[in-house]
């Protein structure tokens, strides 16, 4: 990846969902990758159903696509750093074999992300001791990532102990900038705090991976009122692709350009593919990028 180069990707989560494997189960890897080509994206992230590296690399090469990274659920606080480091090393070995750029990490200890709990009010909170252990652990995982030619990018996420802008501030302050970077996600920032620019402006120097996720304000407000879980919220359509929600990605993209951001911008929107046709929504995102963003470069 060259200096100041931005690569556009789209996540597999619109086709199949790792949190709910039954969603979109009929969408094959070949179907997903071919849709990505039709929508003119340059790559994707690894989904839970993706095959071993040799098979995946062949399918990617046939379509001239690349892998940006892959989600890793860390349990540093629950299982200890030793166990987390062992599983993360295997994760990085896989990513190295598919020529990825980043390892996406989210601490899932106490997470309500996959539980039937109110995602708006029942998120976990770490103690001071847990924060210290988490930051030390992430520094170590970041070193492992670097040894495999990868950057560890931390994903702030609804329903977890690192969700809010304040929690992201604490994570960034407590970790080594050389080894722990930030994955900035517009949708998670907006739904958590009602603002997506503050985190971007404050931590632009640490951001090495970006998710463009849009939100439907009316659905978000209804889900908040009903106390919905994370899964139920996305099944009801709280998330969508850029150009179909309420986030202004022009100001986000302008700030990234201003600070010479280099790396992936990945379109990501958890939706039920039986309701929101994945290719149709990939094309909505592609058209929005072409018509509203690329003229800013």
From Swiss-Prot:
GO terms for biological process: inositol catabolic process. Pfam families: AP_endonuc_2 (PF01261). The keyword Manganese applies. Its EC number is 4.2.1.44. InterPro entries: IolE, IolE/MocC, IolE/XylAMocC-like, Xyl_isomerase-like_sf, Xyl_isomerase-like_TIM-brl. Its cofactor is glutathione; Co(2+); Mn(2+). It catalyses: scyllo-inosose = 3D-3,5/4-trihydroxycyclohexane-1,2-dione + H2O. The keyword Nucleotide-binding does not apply. It comes from the Bacteria. Keywords: Cobalt, Lyase, Manganese. Induction: By inositol. Belongs to the IolE/MocC family. This is Inosose dehydratase. It comes from Bacillus subtilis (strain 168). The gene is iolE.
